[in-house]
Amino acid sequence: MRTIKLVVAYDGSAYLGFQKQKNVQTVQNVLEEALTMLCGEKVVTAGSGRTDTGVHALAQTVTFTTNGRIPCANLVRAAASLLPEDIVVVSAEEMPEGFHARFSARWKTYHYKLLVNEHVNPFMVRYAWQLRQQLEVKAMNEAAELLLGTHDFSAFRSSGSVDTSPIKTIFAAKWQQQGEEILFRISGDGFLYHMVRNIVWSLVQVGMGKRTVQDFAAELTAQRCEFLNEPAPAQGLYLAEVGYREYPQL
């Protein structure tokens, strides 16, 4: 029995999330159908994490076991012929027995994309949160620095979270602006349900001047976010990387 690790990129716009569900189109459903055809046997996959409806992935890790003998290089090419254009197997490699996309992961990095412009860009509607108000990125980064380290992130967990512990460690969190695009990168050893999108929403309020850095700090310390209305829109979020070794120290 072989254990295969895939890195998969996808545009989540047309899917009801990553996780397999009955009678609906999800990324995992489509991927398993293709892999089952390629391997000549029923394939059950495991992802490094769930992404919600409309969320994208630059590098989602997927593992599965198979008795099939198709070489990994051939698998990548063959998958391209069976999968829709919005799901791509970027790479495939054989891993030691016991390796698991989710349980072997040490950290993840997410990106969140904002576009700030007077006019909405119709070609980016599905790929960024578009705002017309200019943001104070310096203040947003001051607040983001408070996330670094190990904290109780209950303030940024949506109801429905199945994670048993709200204690997470954040290794990096920073906004970077280039023209009208403002990109948030955040890396940590784990994330609660809607945690990244809730953090983004709160930091954007700081950038708009509706909340202060001190307000953000108080909410984090108090482990509740009284002003949080809803998560930032799903379409701006990207699962960017999943790490299986210690987070690199810069």
Where are these regions (language model features)?
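Structured-RNA-binding interfaces characteristic of tRNA pseudouridine synthases
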Residues: 1-250
